[in-house]
Amino acid sequence: MRNQNQPVAIEGYPFIGLFAFITLVFALLGWSVCTLLFLGLTLFAAYFFRNPDRYSDAEDAAILAPADGKVVYVGPALEERYFKSEVTKISIFMSVFNVHVNRVPMAGKVVDMFYNKGQFLNAAMDKASLHNEQSGMLLEHTSGRRMLVVQIAGLIARRIVTYPVVGDILQRGARYGLIRFGSRVDIYLEDDVDIQVTVGERVCCGETVLGFLK
């Protein structure tokens, strides 16, 4: 799995390298305003693609937040692709200032994946779950419980990265992907989950407990 140890996600290297090179060129030319501008862009790119370590000692039944951000929806939702029924959905919106590396919320096996091209609506809107570009991963816990995790592109985000493939065994809290520049992650949970978060709450990827498997 990529990005397990680097302090900055490798997807950010091209942006950081480009801005740093342009900064150097302007500095050599003596163009101070442009130098400061691109130095700022270099630092922002490094900040945006930051990849901090996260740790949780929560019990095995705990489901961890797959993304940093704000909870914008908790409640019932119809999931037609896999569950074909109404399940519990939790949606987390990531602004451009949040860490954008995503982590595995529940240990398990990747039993299926999908990718849909789509629109780039504001990821804070509920209809983004239906219409935006998205990449989904269906996990199966050792208990047989399943969970669908969906990375959704936003108004600015135009690139979803997902590292695992079908058949991979993932550890809870491991880095599994990234979405560039503002986005959303939806989790669909089967019944018998004790939800611990509410709408408006800020969550920390890989640390905040969203709920417990019963």
UniProtKB/Swiss-Prot annotation:
Subcellular location, principal: membrane
Q: Give its localization.
A: Cell membrane
Pfam families registered for this protein in UniProt: PS_Dcarbxylase
State the needed cofactors, names only. Answer: pyruvate
Note the InterPro entries from the entry: PS_Dcarbxylase, PSD-A
Active site residues per record: 183
* Molecular function GO labels: phosphatidylserine decarboxylase activity
Its annotated pathway reads: Phospholipid metabolism; phosphatidylethanolamine biosynthesis; phosphatidylethanolamine from CDP-diacylglycerol: step 2/2
Please give, as recorded in its UniProt entry, the membrane topology of this protein: Peripheral membrane protein
Please list the residues that carry the modification Pyruvic acid (Ser). 183
Show the GO cellular component annotation of the record.
Answer: plasma membrane
Q: What superkingdom does the record give?
A: Bacteria
**Positions marked as site (Cleavage (non-hydrolytic)):** 182-183
Post-translational modification here is noted as: Is synthesized initially as an inactive proenzyme. Formation of the active enzyme involves a self-maturation process in which the active site pyruvoyl group is generated from an internal serine residue via an autocatalytic post-translational modification. Two non-identical subunits are generated from the proenzyme in this reaction, and the pyruvate is formed at the N-terminus of the alpha chain, which is derived from the carboxyl end of the proenzyme.
Catalytic reaction equation(s): a 1,2-diacyl-sn-glycero-3-phospho-L-serine + H(+) = a 1,2-diacyl-sn-glycero-3-phosphoethanolamine + CO2
Annotated cofactor note: Binds 1 pyruvoyl group covalently per subunit.
Q: Which UniProt keywords apply?
A: Cell membrane, Decarboxylase, Lipid biosynthesis, Lipid metabolism, Lyase, Membrane, Phospholipid biosynthesis, Phospholipid metabolism, Pyruvate, Zymogen
Gene Ontology biological process: phosphatidylethanolamine biosynthetic process
**EC no.?**
4.1.1.65
- Job description of the protein: Catalyzes the formation of phosphatidylethanolamine (PtdEtn) from phosphatidylserine (PtdSer).
What is its quaternary makeup?
Heterodimer of a large membrane-associated beta subunit and a small pyruvoyl-containing alpha subunit.
Give the family per the record.
Belongs to the phosphatidylserine decarboxylase family. PSD-A subfamily.
Question: What is the protein named?
Answer: Phosphatidylserine decarboxylase proenzyme
Q: Native species of this protein?
A: Syntrophotalea carbinolica (strain DSM 2380 / NBRC 103641 / GraBd1) (Pelobacter carbinolicus)
